[in-house]
Amino acid sequence: MPIVSTFDDVRFRPACATDAQAVATLHAASWRRHYRGAYSDAFLDGDVVQDRLAVWAERLGSPLPEACTFIAERDGVAVGFAHGILGEDPTWGALLDNLHVADGLKRRGVGTRLLTLVAQVVAERTPSSGLYLWVLEQNTDAQAFYAARGGICVGKEFAVPPGGDPRRLNGAPMKLRYAWLFPSKLLASA
């Protein structure tokens, strides 16, 4: 796992169990900001933080050997995180399951650094693997971010409802698959 690094007063490190609340809070805030319309208002306006906390307490409390999670902090406050899962798909490779950055720190390199940290783990542990992610079709800012870093849109499917509960979706939103066949190229551009 990469060592702790710092730039522009932001510290990057592997996440641990004690980060679950901070990660859940960031995750919920990002969903509320970017997924409104695709996810139901009842779900987003409800206790989505508690929903995400259950997920992150499990992921960070009992991490899988094929998973990696990084957190970005500024002045001791979590401002971003990324979570990857190695070998998730036989065709596309490792899954970047989450990448979220607090609104105030977007376009400052935090997301790029988090993406690079996951790509570094992929390159070190599964060097012949690709890297991919899913992004909601309505999240055009994220699509532009990934495309600017060499991600290619290679597929489109219906979004899976959070927690498998279809009431959490509005209609049938679509998600797009972005992929990097050679994630090591992300390291060269970092």
Where on the chain are the PLM-derived regions?
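Acetyl-CoA-dependent GNAT
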Residues: 3-10, 14-18, 25-38, 42-106, ...
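Active-site-adjacent beta-strand anchor residues
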Residues: 13, 135-136
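A generic structural signal for beta-strand entry/edge sites
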Residues: 91-93, 130, 175
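Conserved N-terminal glycine/acidic-rich loop preference
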Residues: 95, 114, 141-153
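Short amphipathic helical patch at the helix-1/turn junction of helix-turn-helix
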Residues: 101, 136-137
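Conserved GNAT acetyl-CoA-binding A-motif
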Residues: 122-134
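Conserved catalytic-core motifs of GNAT/GCN5-like acyltransferases
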Residues: 132-135, 147, 152-177
